[in-house]
Amino acid sequence: MLNPFKHKPALAILTALTGAALVYATNQFAFAQNAVKNTAQQAINPIICRVVGIADGDTLTCLTDAKQQLKVRLHAIDAPEKQQAFGQQAKKHLSDLVYNQTVTLNITNTDRYGRTVADIQLGSLNVNQQMVKDGYAWAYQRYGGSRYIQDEKAARQAKLGLWRDAQPIEPSQWRRMNK
């Protein structure tokens, strides 16, 4: 009679190797899927859509011609949170600029919350840059906002928007303080 437990160590090793291979293959598939997703986003650039909602000073909702809703985070800027000083003003300013307007999205990526991250054009106007110029957002250097540093400095000197506050708090710092 055959002993089914005779090769237990070999079976355990085979099972472990199979499991490791499965984990590796799954990770490679996920990596490839993200690469394809990012490549696909780049391929469909630019996207033209109508702004149908404003969440805050750096997030809006857009409706494409195919009736697809996109939650869009403005690339390279950081506006005050809604509960933060100048948060409501930043939201209103973005709304005044783009609500119910047809805009062009130049997608850069997708953020950890699943939002499309994009530079937004309204005709020849770079909306992201305009929010910084008008003093309703910081140049988000961590995410490519260094191109807007001069606009931020000019808004600070002119005391525009949030720069009227004697000591404005960056949204990232405000979020840490209000966890």
Positions of predicted regions on the chain:
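Small beta-barrel nucleic-acid-binding modules, primarily SNase/OB-fold domains
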Residues: M1-K179
